[in-house]
């Protein structure tokens, strides 16, 4: 018998009977006996699905031989050969089943059939057979098919020769000579390709000889043959390094002449595997770039770009000259393709080409302004801005021009993109102090166009921290004064509203004159009206008037007093700085007086009903604190120590904190770059390959990265599995019912990426045969039962095994439940055994992920489902709870460790992020503190996701943490 690994594997792509109806072998036998060809086709499909689900049904073989095999229906014959592929051909003792003799006669008859498609289909079936006893009788017919007139037959005949030799060499001892003679005489390119595949694996010398004979005309060969030549060269070059130089030269020639996209892709990848020389890599990658630009399929573009990214990661610095060529891919409309191309170009960018990259991206940025598809253009614009920011931060010579470029677009951007530009300006000013004055001036000039309050708050912070000289402070102050508008704000707005109302009354002609007079209240008194009680004032303000207001005035009247609090801090910073750089008391006093007027005006309008939302307590406290500081400054008895303390709090602390944050980010970036570079550093004890000794040491063979990727794609993580995997399976065995039940059941649960597999074992614990025993499963949540177990009979104390696959479509909490059903004795009603519920662990589908602050906030605002969980835990520290939360939810911490505080801190707040295997995003915000009375950890965890299920599932995991950590203490008995 052949080994298990050599057996073919099958995947059920589509179930033609989704009604979940189950049929017994008797039902199938009756359908085959009496049905027409069309009914037999449906029956055969059901039989194939049932067999692929794990029920071999060997008792059907004779019925299929009798009632299906004689049919002339082409579709039925095609299904019949599918059945021959999967039917058990050996008996329990390992010998060939007697019925297969009849099958062999039918197969031999089809191998001599006058219809070439039946012959070809039969030969293709033979390539999947692994039983030497069956194949032995087919050899003469297969050899006869090698000379058939139709190429469709010959292409499968040569593959059948190859596969028969692989199963058993003694069946075709001269297979190498047969294939070699066939390929020399053959004219059809597909037949040649199939023959060369077999020759390359069985007879390397003859394959190399055939390649040498066709080298001169390789550019004129069929692309199919060129592709297998490239595959042979890539594999043989690793085995025989002496020929590598000649192979590379041949591949370079083929790459420059071929027009087939498939051959270009394979040849370019083969060159990158065989050589790390930039003279070889650059032309190869250039061809890949041309391919990515030319093809229309976005999936192919992404595959090609992924390969280019891998090549650059393995050969750092070799592809720098292709930076601008990569950006040609930006002509694609797909945002993912553009993002991938920009990422690669940033990896390739250097100080030599940074200016050209920025110029090209600037042109792309300008094209987004007039794009009719505004949503897509806005996303692409944000992507371009993010890339340009990266260039400017990395290369100082581009920073100044990039800042002015981005500031030109800041008025057209949404809040996220605009605030991103301001954050970038903060970083540039801190990193490159020589650009401070120029950047500050440009920023102040463009702030009138800013529509985002968040971006404007960042700009206010920059003005307060980096305005140094007297002229700079006055320039910033002038902008603030103009941005506030006419003060006092309350009186000027009331005046404007009154004028608008009078103008409206003059132009309106009321059809029915209504008496006007004072309003009399129910208690008989006259009503009075104050500016603080105006409710309808906002109705008199049009959208045009609201948009025409200067920025700070617009934010204040719309109820954004957080910006007003930032403005108050900025004003204090500017006043303190101006006192240090100027001795002009008149100007200083004028600044303080104007500052007091602005801040008091903001407080008064914030307490009125003119604003859309009244001022909150926190903002009011911060503004009033600033007013108190300004009033204290007027006091001549103020001590120098108090002034010094004030300057430290406002001028030194925040700036030094931001500087430290930049340094930490720089260190982390350096660590990541060092970690990435270490992947390509070879250890000092790596063996050196000498061509002269290649024949002596055959074990020193270079790894083929393409073959490794292929194995990883086919086997997944199984290629890394160790012998301990069988032991770890014991942990996944779950009892489905108890030992006292008439049928004992247990399941080994295996979680794959998109499904859960239950290997179920049933044990008949009675002394009777259980007839028509079957298991019914059902699910709760986003789970779907793919396989339906068939009915079976289980002898006394007998065993029955079957496999059930459950499709998982999301990371929601899922439950699998069911029962065992079997017939009662002597015609009694069916009996049931209720099974325990199986809970699908969602943690197997959730992995930690990373995201920048900008992306996190965007998702947080977009996601509509929120689950807020109260936290009360007896863990000793806040950091201990955070560790338990990360362990229990598989989420990654986004907040830098420096911002989390010490282990004994009394307050902790951080953001967490994870992605599921299905592409779902899960966001979390943790806000906890130490209760001063009970010393417990208290607070909240807020979880957001696009769907409700994931938020609830993670909420259950958070609640489970509290149950595990809160232990009841036994105080007395």
Swiss-Prot record:
HEAT repeats: 98-133, 134-170, 279-317, 318-354
Modified positions (Phosphoserine) in chain numbering: 181, 540
Pfam families: Adaptin_N (PF01602), Coatamer_beta_C (PF07718), Coatomer_b_Cpla (PF14806)
Post-translational modification: The N-terminus is blocked.
GO cellular component: a single term: Golgi membrane
GO annotation terms (biological process): endoplasmic reticulum to Golgi vesicle-mediated transport; intra-Golgi vesicle-mediated transport; intracellular mRNA localization; intracellular protein transport; retrograde vesicle-mediated transport, Golgi to endoplasmic reticulum
SMART domains listed in its UniProt record: ARM
Location of the protein in the cell: Cytoplasm; Golgi apparatus membrane; Cytoplasmic vesicle, COPI-coated vesicle membrane
UniProt keyword Transport, yes or no: yes
Top-level taxon of the source organism: Eukaryota
GO MF assignments: structural molecule activity
Xref: InterPro entries: ARM-like (IPR011989), ARM-type_fold (IPR016024), Armadillo (IPR000225), Clathrin/coatomer_adapt-like_N (IPR002553), Coatomer_bsu_C (IPR011710), COPB1 (IPR016460), COPB1_appendage_platform_dom (IPR029446)
Keywords of this entry: Cytoplasm, Cytoplasmic vesicle, ER-Golgi transport, Golgi apparatus, Membrane, Phosphoprotein, Protein transport, Repeat, Transport
Membrane disposition: Peripheral membrane protein
Secretion signal, residue range per the UniProt entry: none
Effect of loss of the gene: Causes a block in ER to Golgi transport. Exhibits exaggerated ER structures displaying interconnected networks of ER cisternae. Cells arrest at all stages of the vegetative cycle.
Subunit structure of this chain's protein: Oligomeric complex that consists of at least the alpha, beta, beta', gamma, delta, epsilon and zeta subunits. The complex interacts with ARF1 and PAB1.
Misc: Present with 26000 molecules/cell in log phase SD medium.
Physiological role: The coatomer is a cytosolic protein complex that binds to dilysine motifs and reversibly associates with Golgi non-clathrin-coated vesicles, which further mediate biosynthetic protein transport from the ER, via the Golgi up to the trans Golgi network. Coatomer complex is required for budding from Golgi membranes, and is essential for the retrograde Golgi-to-ER transport of dilysine-tagged proteins. Required for mitochondrial morphology.
Record PANTHER family: COATOMER SUBUNIT BETA
Name used for this protein in its record: Coatomer subunit beta
Organism lineage string: Eukaryota, Fungi, Dikarya, Ascomycota, Saccharomycotina
Gene (UniProt): SEC26
